[in-house]
């Protein structure tokens, strides 16, 4: 039976209001807020690569080597931010995966229930048609007996 008033059904995740079905952009913004150091590391690495490219075009080997070292530091910073964020947010990610799994199971169950309801409706229509058809045959046989 569909939820008519569109209020959410009670769930074991009610204690965690941060869990909800989110769009891709909501997920990106949430992840940027959770781990702001990773994009900073990406930006630092990209900037170092851009400066290295400019130095290479200008044939400035000292600046080129300095920017390659800066790129390595940017990579190290980004890797550290990824590992530290993974450790720090590991439990929350586990809870989110459990929530997404439960949500998928709920959606699958709703699809199965809708499919079963559709089959029941079709079965009822088929039985009604057979009853009407049988009643019409009986009426035709009785009319034939009366005439003949």
From Swiss-Prot:
Compartments, record wording: Mitochondrion membrane
InterPro entries according to UniProt: Hypoxia_induced_domain (IPR007667), RCF1 (IPR050355)
Membrane topology: Multi-pass membrane protein
GO cellular component terms attached to this protein's record: mitochondrial membrane
Domain HIG1: 9-100
UniProt KW keywords: Coiled coil, Membrane, Mitochondrion, Transmembrane, Transmembrane helix
Keyword 4Fe-4S listed: no
Gene Ontology process terms (BP): mitochondrial respirasome assembly
Coiled coil regions in record: 89-148
TM segment ranges: 36-53, 72-89
Domain of life: Eukaryota
Assembly information from the UniProt record: Associates with the respiratory chain complex III/complex IV supercomplex.
Family: Belongs to the RCF1 family.
Protein function: Cytochrome c oxidase subunit which plays a role in assembly of respiratory supercomplexes.
Protein name, per record: Respiratory supercomplex factor 1, mitochondrial
């Amino acid at each position: 039976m569909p939820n008519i008033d569109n209020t959410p059904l009670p769930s074991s995740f009610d204690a965690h209001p941060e869990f909800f079905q989110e769009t891709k952009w909501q997920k990106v913004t949430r992840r940027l807020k959770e781990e702001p150091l990773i994009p900073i590391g990406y930006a630092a690495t990209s900037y170092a690569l851009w400066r290295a490219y400019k130095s290479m075009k200008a044939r400035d080997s000292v600046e080129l080597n300095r920017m390659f070292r800066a790129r390595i530091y940017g990579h190290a910073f980004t890797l550290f931010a990824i590992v530290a964020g993974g450790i720090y947010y590991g439990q929350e990610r586990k809870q989110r995966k459990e929530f997404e799994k439960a949500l998928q199971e709920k959606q699958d169950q709703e699809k199965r229930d809708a499919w079963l309801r559709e089959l029941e409706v079709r079965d009822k229509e088929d039985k009604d048609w057979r009853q009407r058809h049988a009643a019409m045959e009986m009426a035709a046989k009785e009319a034939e007996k009366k005439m003949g």
